[in-house]
Amino acid sequence: MTAETAFSAAPLPPVEQRIDVLIVGAGPVGLFAAFEAGVLGLSCVLVDVLDRPGGQCTELYPEKPIYDIPALVSCTAQELVDRLLAQCAPFGYPILCGRRAETVETIEGEHGRRFRVTTSVGDVFDCAAVLITAGNGAFAPQRVALPEAAALEGRHLHYAVRDTARFAGKHVVVAGGGDSALDWALALRKTAARVTLVHRREGFRAADASVAGMRAAVAAGEMDFQVGMIGRLDSAPDGTLTGIALRQREGETRLPCDELIALYGLVSEPGPIASWDVEMRAGRIVVETTAYETSRAGVFAAGDIALYPNKQKLILSGFHEVAMALRRAYRYANPDKTLVHTHTSNDTNLQSRLHAAAE
């Protein structure tokens, strides 16, 4: 199973839903948390600011080898994400990407305290607990640092590709030197009138296969590659993008450009989490270590964003943290029930569900 088959890549309209747990962050730790929620019978939704699940593993180093996941001798970061997506898929929990959790409001009702969480696209979740698995915080794209860029953002300047159809028949410039830049340049050459990849140097921080594919496409005349830095964005009187000025060793070169896709990578920022009334230190959330609960009861943190004595920033540590956090969250979601520990090997209902999904 790939990331593309485990969630909807198409933009989804805002939702309003009552659930047991909202998981903020769909990286490896958040994905395993979804599986654990399913094992415990908790309803949940995952939200992530990025346009696909996987967090840093998918966005920053998908080809990086990982050697310290139990029972896996080695796998790439993307392979780990794909396996985790396959593991939690039988429970059918929504993974809502391209939205950021903005506010967490406490609501008191006849059945006790719950939370009302809103997102950047207008989702509203009524939940018993919130589990923050946001890695190093919310990611934001590294923007084009030119004064004329802001007016073009969302119209002709893009930091992600959400709809390839909008580039049909256009002169497209893709700027960047990572996997995303090369992969999208290669993909769009079949749709756009012409694609030019721009990078500040000849070397790339991308998979060898992607680099080889790009160079082969350039050699075949299917796309162009230019070394240089974007120095200016040119617009028509009506505000449409017409071209870019490229600063090169030999001087300035102007490239025709209807749409610019800048894929310079991501920068980490705390985002709205800093205003959620949880104790933070150096950009991380302080938790206790019996259930990885924050200073705000019912709000938990796990993975790289969690801070406690002798904390190790390891994926496997995050797996343990969410397992413990969700068992405490179960109490908030089911105050009148006692969670009875059952080994998954003895849980016939769970086995039936997993086997049915595999068939």
Swiss-Prot record:
It comes from the Bacteria. FAD binds at D48, Q56, Y61, A101, F139, D304, S345. The keyword Membrane does not apply. Keywords: FAD, Flavoprotein, NADP, Oxidoreductase. SUPFAM superfamilies: FAD/NAD(P)-binding domain. Its EC number is 1.18.1.2. Its cofactor is FAD. Residues 341-352 have a biased composition (Polar residues). InterPro entries: FAD/NAD-bd_sf (IPR036188), FAD/NAD-binding_dom (IPR023753), Fd--NADP_Rdtase_type_2 (IPR022890), Ferredoxin-NADP_redctase_2 (IPR050097). Binds 1 FAD per subunit. One of its GO terms (molecular function) is ferredoxin-NADP+ reductase activity. Residues 340-359 are annotated as: Disordered. Transmembrane segments: none annotated. Belongs to the ferredoxin--NADP reductase type 2 family. PANTHER family: THIOREDOXIN REDUCTASE 1-RELATED-RELATED. HAMAP family: FENR2. Homodimer. This is Ferredoxin--NADP reductase. The lineage of its organism: Bacteria, Pseudomonadati, Pseudomonadota, Betaproteobacteria, Burkholderiales.
